[in-house]
């Protein structure tokens, strides 16, 4: 604001890997505040850029929605729920206040030859109609799996949306799992936990090889994906800041009973 420049604010809702959702009303209030330049003139409004890959079913920017009154653009990774993992093309939309940017984005895609291919359009057109139902079914499976883990391993810390947030439409099918550890020093505890993480994932991918995969993606059509560190973006994160917890992505089609059995066997082995 002081420089009379445009502030581009980028946020991921829910966050990855800890599946956090901010107070949207508070966010709206901050984004809507009137600010002044160094000369006392009214500053340019900020632009809010939302990554809603983990909840592509939510209408954050529709008329009357919380963020409809601020300049906003939302995007989702097409490689996740929109295509069920069948293509990599994503998409973005803007609300009425942010629509001025749509033509600029389209021009950028054209100049960079970065538009989706005909095949990608075809895949998205085929998969998008079933997306909301797939999200609903996957969330149901995830909630059941999370409840089971909380029951058989209450010492574990699970990052997942609350029932209250779920009732508001935040129904992701991914959670992060911080396994209990032991040791006399922080280093011993971290080493033990990392070994335990790999023991769990090895059990899952070897005992359920047709469904459990060591993969960082999300929104897949079937099976269960496990990964450590909990997000692919941590490949560029310095080692000391990496989050060595397991991220688990559950699908609408999964043998949940078998996954529960393998997890229970794992718990009993530690």
Residue ranges of model-derived segments:
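Generic structural signal for residues positioned in beta-strands
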Residues: 74, 174-176, 247
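Conserved beta-strand positions
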Residues: 11, 50, 177, 248-250
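Short beta-strand-to-loop capping motifs
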Residues: 94, 177-181, 250-252
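Conserved PLP-enzyme active-site core in the AAT-like
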Residues: 1-150
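PLP-dependent enzyme catalytic core of the Aspartate aminotransferase-like
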Residues: 1-7, 21-42, 222-270
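Short, acidic Gly/Pro/Ser/Thr-rich loop/turn segments
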Residues: 100, 182-185, 255
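Conserved small-domain helix->loop->beta segment predominantly found in fold-type I
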Residues: 123-135, 143-243
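Structural alpha-beta junctions
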Residues: 32-44, 68-71, 150-157, 202-216, ...
